[in-house]
Amino acid sequence: MRRRRCDLQPKRTRMCDLQPKRTSMCDLPPKLVGEKILTRIPITSLRAVRSTCKLWNALTKDRVLGKAAAQFLGFMTMDSKVCSVRFHLRRSKEEEEDTMDLSIKQVDLLNQVEISRVYHCDGLLLCVAKDNSRVVVWNPYLGQTRWIRPRTESNIGDSYALGYDINRNHKILRMVQTRNVSVYRYEIYDLRSNSWRVLEVTPNGEMDPNHPLYGVSVKGNTYFFAHEDSSSGEIDEDGDIIDLEDFLLCFDFTTETFGLRLPLPFHSTIDATVTLSCVRDQQLAVLYHNEGLHSDDRFTTVEFWVTTSIEPNSVSWSKFLTVDMRPLALTGVRFDNDMGATFFIDEDEKVAVVFDLDGYLSTESARYHTAFISGKDGFFKPVTLGVAPNVGEPCPRTGHIPTTYRPPLVCSSTYLPSLVQVNQQRKRKERHV
């Protein structure tokens, strides 16, 4: 039998068989992607990450939406720009040094306009333009924005709040300052119907909604720090108000009304600092700094309280942390306590991070944006974020420029991304009622 020659020849090896197989991004182990890659990517870049492949899209939902991250992820305004914030602290139980990571990066998407305040609710951010001419609702996870103009001409004293009703319809409350600066009228914008409406409501107390630290959203409703009418306060012999009853007021986005007065866990004095924050959209937190009764007793204590339960008409409290500021008196480290002291808390590490200006010393020629990190057992660490520019405007008559500074304002709750669509509907024009 005649044997074929091809059977005797060795099989040829192709050059492509010798080359190693290429590994694509989607071939990386899920654990590596989740723990080493996603934890280092800014929230504002997640849209591009999700489009990489189906696996990465699923991992972002599981790790970020599933609350797997152990870090604080949030947003803040600093020097009229929106910045993302990433914070992680691991306190050592032994004599080794604590490890801390505080990263602040400017968001390029919103660079087209100066932003004065940012409010957070349910994974959405409400950013207010510095001149109050418009606001933008932004979903950082989806990369979507909706620009909204006010129903009527804006005032510099106008303020806003973001929330949602029982059906998860997201709404914006606008508080319009009238000629009487202590009196506001109220309007509401519905994102689903793309329309404004006037509300006939009156809160049971005086608020200062224009103060960037007094309104915080929890479970879809916004809570404000408020006090009784100034005319009913306790007055000293010089005619100055020395005491007012203070409390919380809730705006319920389902009923679109203000609720009953809710008690605070302390009674604050006129000169005390009270600011609100929240924990993962579920709990309200409050900072209370009593500076002392005398000028030589400025450095006393800072208390942090967290709600154990909260509803529009009921609340209960538990003390989270007390910081004794007196040992820091000689170092010059203290809160500015004018317009600052926005904060968030880390329940796992039992620390509070307060953003403010550094305590001013006469020997210094500049002010600094500062993060004050405080915790148990006297732990206190100030971290300088950068020089705070003087935003004072020159006097038209004399040209004198006053020294005016604006502290960084942080969104209080850990940011948990949302799948809520906020894209503007092109076919339906904005309506005013």
Swiss-Prot record:
Keyword annotations from UniProtKB, A to Z: Kelch repeat, Repeat
Domain F-box: 23-71
Kelch repeat residue intervals: 170-216, 286-337
Pfam families recorded: FBA_1
Keyword Acyltransferase: no
NCBIfam families: F_box_assoc_1
Protein name, as recorded: F-box/kelch-repeat protein At1g24800
